[in-house]
Structure formats: C-alpha cells, structure tokens
Amino acid sequence: MKLKIDCIRKRHCYCHCLVSNVYKSNFKFFRIGMAYAKVLRRIREQKTNYNRRKSMLMGHRDFITVQISNENTQVQVIHPELTGDKVISSAHSRFLIEKGWKGSRKNIPAAYLTGYFAGKKALANGTNSAILYSGTRQYTQRMAAALKGIIDAGLEIPADEETFPSSDRINGEHLKIKNDVKNIKSSIDTGAKSK
C-alpha cells in the first residue's frame, strides 16, 4: 500500500506502477488511471498487424499470404470483403507428393512450386494482380520463392527482383535429395490447360 501511495505522490504514469509490481495487488484502478491497458486479442496472439492490414486494405486489391509450417507450405490468394476475407485460390505443398516430390515440402523449391500452382489456380479464377501481405511474419527467402512462383505463373505483383532467391536455389541444386522442378512445373501447366 505504501508503494501505491508513493507512486501517486510522484505522479508517475501507470507504466511505473506496473514495473513496481503494484498490479499484482487487489487494486485495479489508480487515481492516475487504469493499471491495465487492454490489448486486442489478435495482437496479443500475434495473428494480425493492424497497421499493415489497414495500409493493405486501402489499396482495394487482392492479396497473397504465404504460411510455412513445420512440414508444409500454403499459399492463398484472398479477396478482402466486409463480411470477411474470401479465398480465391489456395495451394498446399501436399500436392507435390502426387507429382513425385521427394524430401521436404517447406524448402525453397517446394515453396516456389506451391506458389506457381496457386498462381495458375488464381488465373483460372479470374485474378490478374495482387499484392503480398506478410502480416506479422517476416519476409524470408521461402516467402520470396513462393512470390516468384506466383509471378512466373502470370500474376502481376509489385516486387523487387533482387529479393528473390537465385535460380540454382529455386531448382534445388543445393539439396541432397534431387527433384526435377521443371518436370513438375510442366505437369502443373498441363493440368491447368486441361481444366
């Protein structure tokens, strides 16, 4: 209690009260204001960066998300609406198993082919341009490889060519388990033409 009174006398902000462990007591409000400032749930869970999302929505364009998990890569082309975001096309790296892929499905060549597949599906659904929305995630080489795959599929996306991985890494020449990226890419093309 003495610590609380000293804090009010010095007229410190509630941040000082939090540091001095007053927030652990039964007092929820202080004379100088609340001891707890509410943080939105999606910010707390690190799911949404609202500043990035607001600037992305101001452009009135479709956007691309790349999600890389422990085993797979998922690329989605999304159209924002007031009722909620609508997925136009989605590609998951599990489809690579059907094409004869061996090894990891989250590396740079797998991300490139997943992005290429998502781009072909988006073109078939009538989407010609989009922007990348990374959300709370950092822009990595695997995300750049997926973005290059979407651009190679034919979508118009503003991106800097210098950020993309080299063609040797996209073709998987640095990997121990070799996969034929060009054959899988051509099979994606033939599958898109048949539909």
Give the ranges of each region predicted by the language model:
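Cysteine-centered motifs
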Residues: 7, 13-17
